[in-house]
């Protein structure tokens, strides 16, 4: 009996082994690597635990359950063996493969964060997202090719090919497929919301585009411009301080046009609002800087009222009242509503003074006539 046990012992041992050179005639229900009790499967090298698969199916990588995991890297299909920093996560073939000193990056998708060497706190989610970023930090790219060629910092892109271009710019935000796709050089502080918005913005800073295909033409050196509405476009290829809302409200250097993109005119320095086809409103309030702008001074004792004879002579020669602009002048230059109302009031007050004086003369004449009639 003792000899029989010794004979079958090697067979029993071989039945429980998993050969390093490969196995055949396996059955997946009974041949596997793992545990049959409620314990974790642990992987070690040099007797140091690196990976643990919990009975619940969770992966615990080089970490104690109760401690945060920012001091480790988790790499599946990406990363490399020379990575010295911590807190990186890579899932995807070719993802994060050039990393060296960068830390706390997340790369999910084929070639995501592929070129990053020393950047920190980047997130790339999608094939080729943040693929060429080398040293940039705090970027977020979500979508295939999002931030694909960008190399700057603090950029956010959501959508296929959003912020894809070869740019070193910072602080850009692109939401929507192909938004800010063509940025180059140091384009910074731009915001594009809507598919294809700022599609071909090459260079420029502090610009905003909201809407589908908004400001999508070729733009260079654009700055401080805002475009809102689907298919709304700039008036030129290098706009500065420009506004276009729905092709109805336009702005240029702080001057606004409603219904017209022409916000300039002759002798219009200092004006800020231009409205085509008129304004209809129930209430307008015009403010005056001081009392001198109104015409009450006409009633002061020292006011020099133009005699009626002189007024008649002026009208005969000039065909208009003193101080009142000619018809041609109005055609050429328009009217200042506030000043013209004050001028009209002045003329009414002067007319009132003439009427009062004439009435006094009439009363004196009536009194004299009555006296003469009584003498008779």
Mark where each language-model region is:
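C-terminal intramolecular chaperone/autoprocessing and neck/assembly modules of extracellular spikes
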Residues: 17-25, 44-49, 55, 61-71, ...
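Amphipathic, non-membrane alpha-helical segments that mediate helix-helix packing
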Residues: 341-345
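Glycine- and small/polar-enriched repetitive beta-structure motifs of secreted/surface proteins
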Residues: 32, 37-272, 276
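Bacterial Sec-dependent N-terminal signal peptides
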Residues: 1-18, 358, 365, 372
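Short, basic/low-complexity N-terminal boundary segments at the transition from targeting/disordered tails
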Residues: 11-27, 220-228
């Amino acid at each position: 009996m003792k000899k029989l046990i010794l004979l079958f012992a090697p067979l029993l041992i071989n039945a429980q082994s998993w050969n390093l050179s490969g196995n055949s005639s396996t059955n997946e229900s009974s041949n596997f690597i793992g545990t049959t009790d409620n314990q974790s499967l642990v992987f070690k090298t040099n007797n140091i635990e690196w990976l643990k698969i919990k009975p619940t199916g969770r992966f615990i990588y080089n970490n104690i359950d109760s401690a945060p995991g920012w001091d480790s890297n988790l790499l599946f299909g990406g990363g490399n063996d020379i990575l010295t920093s911590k807190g990186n996560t890579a899932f995807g073939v070719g993802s994060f493969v050039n990393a060296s000193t960068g830390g706390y990056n997340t790369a999910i998708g084929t070639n995501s964060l592929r070129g990053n060497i020393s950047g920190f706190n980047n997130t790339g989610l999608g094939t080729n997202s943040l693929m060429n970023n080398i040293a940039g930090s705090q970027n977020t790219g979500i979508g295939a090719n999002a931030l694909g060629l960008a190399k700057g910092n603090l950029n956010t892109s959501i959508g296929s090919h959003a912020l894809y271009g070869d740019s070193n710019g910072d602080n850009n935000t692109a939401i929507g497929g192909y938004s800010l796709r063509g940025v180059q050089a140091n384009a910074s502080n731009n915001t594009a919301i809507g598919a294809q918005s700022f599609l071909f913005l090459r260079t420029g800073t502090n610009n905003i585009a909201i809407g589908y295909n908004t400001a999508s033409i070729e733009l260079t050196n654009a700055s401080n411009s805002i475009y809102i509405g689907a298919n709304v476009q700039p008036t030129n290829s290098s706009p500065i301080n420009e506004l276009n809302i729905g092709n109805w409200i336009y702005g240029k250097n702080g001057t606004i046009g409603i219904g017209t993109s022409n916000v300039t005119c002759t002798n219009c320095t200092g004006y800020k609002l231009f409205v085509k086809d008129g304004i209809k409103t129930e209430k307008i309030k015009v403010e005056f800087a001081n009392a001198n702008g109104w015409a009450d001074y006409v009633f002061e004792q020292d006011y020099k009222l133009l005699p009626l004879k002189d007024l008649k002579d002026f009208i005969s020669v000039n065909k208009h009242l003193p101080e009142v602009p000619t018809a041609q002048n109005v055609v050429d230059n328009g009217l200042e509503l506030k000043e013209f109302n004050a001028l009209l009031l002045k003329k009414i007050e002067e007319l009132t003074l003439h009427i009062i004086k004439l009435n006094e003369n009439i009363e004196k004449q009536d009194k004299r006539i009555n006296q003469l009639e009584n003498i008779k």
